[in-house]
């Protein structure tokens, strides 16, 4: 997931699929596209993904927790939306869920009306990048989900949609003996949505069995370590790559990983670009990944704001 248009040039080099999401773009991922590990859809699969639907609605309702009445209305609408697709290759989408909520609301269910009102702008309005059927091309080597134009109110929904999409690709790859790698930039996006956090934690732990390797990236390690659930991401990770940090984050990592003075210095904000520290199963390794400016990859990874803006402007002008 690319939130800052940092991966498009790398994607171009590998001829990746690079769908762009957000207002004015046609790319769409169906956040309700799910199946079992063998590609089928059973009622148990719908039931097992209850947290996904709750997370979707809470993100649409600006993070407000659903009441018991709203949870019941949502469950009824979800089951009704999926029922025609059980055992079939087709899947419902958010427009179907919206339609079921409206139908229930017209029958007098006030909670369904509230849910439909919250969902409406994500189905019929400017935030509909995840409302319809999936229409993006999948590259077997690399896919860049470009999210730089996805607004703040859509970000949790975007994450849920991508996780669902990657889950299906991971199941398919597993059936063909292939591994799947997911780089999740700005993983702290979902920290304030408890159901979405549950989805992420389940995804992070369970999808390992199906050959998924997940790389979570954040510039806010303190936000991860201070979160009661997100801190478990650290506990269940075997490899850490730390780049130079601000002092507060540097101190936190030093305490947690018992860094020596020289290791601590490698994480200071003034350390050379491309250097840092790698921790693998407790073993600490100094990292020097500086790239020669003459190397073609130098400009691919160059995030200097002025140079990057010029590159992006030139690319958009083509």
Where are these regions (language model features)?
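A short beta-strand-to-loop transition that corresponds to the Sensor-1 phosphate-sensing loop
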Residues: 3, 217-221, 244-247
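C-terminal regions of RecA-like/P-loop NTPase motor modules
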Residues: 224-318
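P-loop NTPase motor domains
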Residues: 3-19, 23-212, 216, 225-228, ...
């Amino acid at each position: 997931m690319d939130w800052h248009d940092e991966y498009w040039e790398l994607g171009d080099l590998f001829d990746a699929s690079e769908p762009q999401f957000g207002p004015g773009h046609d790319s769409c991922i169906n956040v309700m596209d799910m199946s079992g590990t063998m590609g089928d859809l059973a009622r148990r699969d719908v039931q097992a993904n209850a947290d996904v639907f709750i997370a979707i609605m809470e993100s649409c309702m600006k993070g407000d927790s659903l009441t018991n009445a709203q949870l019941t209305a949502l469950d009824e609408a979800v089951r009704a939306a999926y029922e025609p697709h059980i055992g079939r290759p087709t899947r419902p989408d958010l427009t179907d869920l919206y339609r079921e909520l409206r139908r229930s609301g017209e029958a007098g269910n006030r909670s369904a009306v509230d849910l439909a009102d919250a969902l409406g702008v994500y189905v019929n309005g400017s935030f509909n990048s995840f409302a319809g059927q999936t229409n993006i091309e999948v590259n077997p080597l690399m896919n860049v989900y470009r999210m730089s134009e996805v607004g703040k109110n859509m970000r949790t929904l975007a994450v849920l949609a991508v996780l669902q999409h990657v889950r299906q690709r991971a199941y398919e790859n597993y059936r063909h003996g292939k591994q799947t790698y997911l780089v999740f930039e700005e993983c702290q996006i979902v920290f304030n949505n408890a159901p979405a956090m549950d989805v992420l934690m389940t995804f992070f732990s369970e999808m390992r069995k199906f050959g998924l390797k997940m790389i979570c990236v954040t510039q806010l390690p303190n936000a991860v370590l201070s979160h009661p659930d997100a801190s478990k991401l650290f506990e269940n990770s075997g490899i850490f790559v730390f780049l130079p940090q601000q002092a507060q984050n540097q101190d936190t990592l030093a305490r947690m990983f018992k860094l020596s003075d020289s290791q601590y210095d490698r994480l200071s904000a003034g350390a050379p670009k491309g250097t840092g520290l790698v921790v693998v199963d407790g073993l600490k390794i100094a990292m020097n990944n500086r790239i020669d400016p003459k190397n073609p990859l130098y400009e691919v990874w160059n995030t200097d704001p002025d140079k990057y803006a010029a590159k992006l402007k030139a690319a958009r002008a083509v």
